[in-house]
Regions:
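Generic alpha-helical propensity signal that fires on short helical segments
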Residues: 87-91, 95, 145-147, 157-159, ...
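Short, solvent-exposed coil/turn segments at beta-strand boundaries
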Residues: 122-124, 140-148
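A surface-exposed partner-binding patch
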Residues: 1-137, 187
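A recognition module on extended beta-rich or small alphabeta surfaces enriched in W/G with H and D/E
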Residues: 139, 150-187
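Short, flexible beta-strand-to-coil junctions
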Residues: 130-135, 142-145, 153-156
Length: 188
């Protein structure tokens, strides 16, 4: 179950941060427009504030997305957004950096690249959930199957060679649960 894997990884991430830096994780206090319920204490002189993950108090209604796209959103994706709020979640998968987008009090919708870029509409169920690898390509999940992909959506990468065509996404995990259980907070 993704909620358990997410909680376990958030605990491990927090533990490693505290061991390395002596304090709970910190993020830029301006990561959200309004003060987050995840914030702990006050921002320091450099504008960083400690945070902790908390239970999601206002789950996203996936029925709207399911009706709009005529699909069934898989449980892993629903649980990623409806289990906990977190302001930072990153680690390493097979030596590559994985950085999830935060799930905050302000998270209300998912970003479908196919809504903005017609050349990639052959992947209508992929949503961006973060960044992957040294070049920060998009970390995407297929919201129907739950499979996790890396996908370079930077038009500059392919501008001349492919005239705006993107490479196909590359599978990196069979599910979000699989990804979270294989993720390590420190590079191995």
């Amino acid at each position: 179950m993704l909620k358990d894997a997410l909680r376990d990884y958030l605990d491990l991430y927090t533990e490693c941060w505290e061991k390395e830096f002596g304090d709970p994780p910190m993020v830029d206090a301006e990561i959200t427009e309004e003060p987050s319920i995840c914030f702990v204490g006050e921002a320091d002189d450099e504008g960083y504030i400690q945070w902790k993950y908390v239970e999601q108090p206002h789950p996203i209604d996936f029925g709207v997305i399911e009706d709009k796209y005529q699909i069934h959103v898989c449980e892993d994706v629903k649980q990623l957004y409806n289990s906990y709020l977190f302001l930072e979640l990153q680690g390493f998968l097979d030596g590559q950096r994985v950085h999830f987008d935060p799930v905050t009090d302000e998270t209300k919708d998912l970003f479908f690249p196919s809504d903005d870029a017609p050349p990639i509409d052959q992947y209508p169920h992929l949503v961006i959930i973060g960044l992957y690898g040294p070049m920060d390509v998009s970390l995407c999940v297929d919201i129907v199957t739950g499979k996790v992909y890396s996908w370079d959506l930077d038009p500059d990468t392919y501008e001349y060679e492919y005239e705006g065509r993107y490479k196909d996404p590359e599978l990196i995990a069979d599910s979000l649960t699989d990804l979270l259980t294989r993720l390590t907070p420190m590079k191995q």
